[in-house]
Amino acid sequence: MLQLIATPSNALADEPVSIRAIGLPPSQIVTITATVKDEKENLFQSKAFYKANEAGEVDLEQASALGGDYVGVHPMGLFCCLKPKRAFQRLIKKDVMNSPLCICLDLYDSVCWLETVRIPPKASQIVHRWFAGPGVKREQIREGRVRGALFLPPGKGPFPGIIDLFGSIGGLVEFRASLLASRGFAVLALAYFAYEDLPKVLLEEDLDYFEEAANFLLAHPKIQQPGIGVISVSKGAEIGLAMACYLKQVVATVCINGPSAIFDFPLKYRDLVVTPMRLAFEKIQFHGSGAACFRHCWDPQNMLNPPKILPVEKAQGKILFIVGENDQCLASKLHAQRAMDRLRSHGRSSGRMLAYPGAGHLIEPPYSPFCFACWDSVLGKPMLWGGDPIAHAAAQVHSWREIQKFFRQHLLQSGGKL
């Protein structure tokens, strides 16, 4: 009897799944597909074609995909290569506490490459991908000006505390924070515009707001002293790096594909005002899909005005730069290299860079679907993020391990629990 087996069928979203088809005729060509809908009913799909071995089995841990959305041996390729049916959609789990992403795996005993040809699958399996582990708690935060959601691991603590910042997407994005909490960190997913009573659009980087958030987190009884970490991406990584430079509360910072200077919006902190460098919009390029490529608009070669460059040498903690070498939003490797060079020129060894060939801009937790481009509501156009799906997927797996290792090394003190 034909069977499609996925184990575990119920797991955290950052855990791998083993997929096997059994009971096939020897050398049978098959199609395996993955399908999922987000909370807005947007459909995402992937497929790959395989040949059964002499025992009538296809084990994705060993079998090489002959074609489809990827080729070669990629056990989680169906998850990483999920693509939106409607162009420029990004798969983001909103409700991370109450429901999983339900991914349907289907097995067909032929090559099914035309969407218009509908035949019933020979076997199916539902895989539930959760974003919060057992015992993780979520607290809605409205404290002073601070708006966000705090995720706490099970247990008494104290736990190493982290602030999680996303970029120009705005609002409150929680899936990374909840997964980190499932791994033993207390994480504040922090909104800073386009959420509740916060500014509807980003007009300035108010570092006093982020210091208020850091103080709130450190004052929480379940947060380990004396300092916190920051994980940040894109525009959030610009803010994260500024926090590392100016806030003594921050002792470990992860910057994912962010600039090393202040761009587009002024940075304000107490009496300090840093006027931004302006994006060179005349350098925007358009991909064949119509998505806008901003990579050349943030040219670090033109960063000749020292006050606009973030003074990384002032950072009291450690900084981990994670960069995708095929990032099409900005030249993130060049920016990280500039920051590393500046640290070295001041005799500092507190920075480290992980560069991933083939990875794009949106480096997220493992097995998150690769997003090459998606709609930007502020621009009113799709943004190009770049990357190769398989190389990007490998970067997500490796960087997630390194991020956790980095925070454990630099946030855990005697008496802390993880």
Swiss-Prot record:
A motif (Microbody targeting signal) lies at residues 416-418. Its EC number is 2.3.1.-. The active site is at S234 (charge relay system), D327 (charge relay system), H361 (charge relay system). Keywords: Acyltransferase, Fatty acid metabolism, Lipid metabolism, Peroxisome, Transferase. GO terms for cellular component: peroxisome. Acyltransferase which efficiently conjugates very long-chain and long-chain fatty acids to taurine. Shows no conjugation activity in the presence of glycine. This is Acyl-coenzyme A amino acid N-acyltransferase 2.
